Amino acid sequence: DALPILFGEKQKGEAGESVVSLPLSSLHSFKRHPFRVPDDEKMEETVKSVRQYGILVPAIVREDKAQGNYEIIAGHRRKRACELTGLSEMPAIVRELTDDEAVIIMVDSNIQREDILPSEKAWAYRMKMEALSHQGVKGEAYTADLVGEAAGDCARTVQRYVRLTYLNPKLLDFADHGKVSLAVAEKLSFLSGEEQGWVLKTLGGNVAVLSKSQAEALKEESENESLTEKCVADIINREVKRISITISAKKIKDYFPQDYTKDQMEEVIFELLESWKERMCQDS
């Protein structure tokens, strides 16, 4: 086996922890692991790296005495890469962790990935918030702030993502595929399961037509306990007046160098809008 040659039967981790080589058959996924492990292009790159260099960063696992094996805390993609490479073992650090400690490590080791779906981020944030709450961190806003700090999101954004975990699975799937915005999905999450079912029935799969104002109207009717199936249909089928904003080049040209092209101006404007949105998020 290539791994014992690369790592030896036992090495030391960065903090003096022992690194051991464990059979892949003795490793199982983290309970309620919210992240996908797809066989995509990035996995192909990981497999190539494993073939060339081996596993450079050991997985983190904990002993599962009930099953007589180990639960992966961090390293699900590395394990899959080892399987695809044909290896039978992989290096790992075995730690004694509580359920809450394990959740926090699991989330933090995955949350910075670029290809995370809204549903994955939503469940990861919720799991970490619950874990921190169990550890004595008080206050939803403060807990959300701690969770967001590790992921580069503000507390309000974290709370909005957590709301997605209360969505009908079909509506959550729409959010994953970009058919509904985070703002609309958040509003719909306050509806009961039955009410969300009415929304799906009325939309017939065409959820992209639902605007934020319509979603807000649905939420308000639900909170007032006056939302019926007919009311859902009336709100969704209501024609919404679209807002269109046009800014003439004459009004903004003085803010840019004379040699700036239209595309360069647009790029600067959108960068400024993104900065403004981030500040608004932090203040909310």
List the predicted regions and their residue ranges.
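Short, charged/polar connector segments at secondary-structure boundaries
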Residues: 1-95, 106-112
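Short acidic DE-rich linear segments
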Residues: 4, 278-284
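Helical mechanochemical/support elements of P-loop NTPase systems and associated helical scaffolds
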Residues: 23, 39-42, 46, 69, ...
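Short polybasic/polar patches that bind polyanions
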Residues: 51, 83, 149, 175-176
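Glycine-centered loop/turn motif at secondary-structure junctions
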Residues: 54, 86, 152, 178-179
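Amphipathic, charge-rich alpha-helical segments that serve as recognition/docking helices
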Residues: 80-166, 190
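Amphipathic alpha-helical extensions and coiled-coil-like segments
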Residues: 123-131, 145-146, 155-278
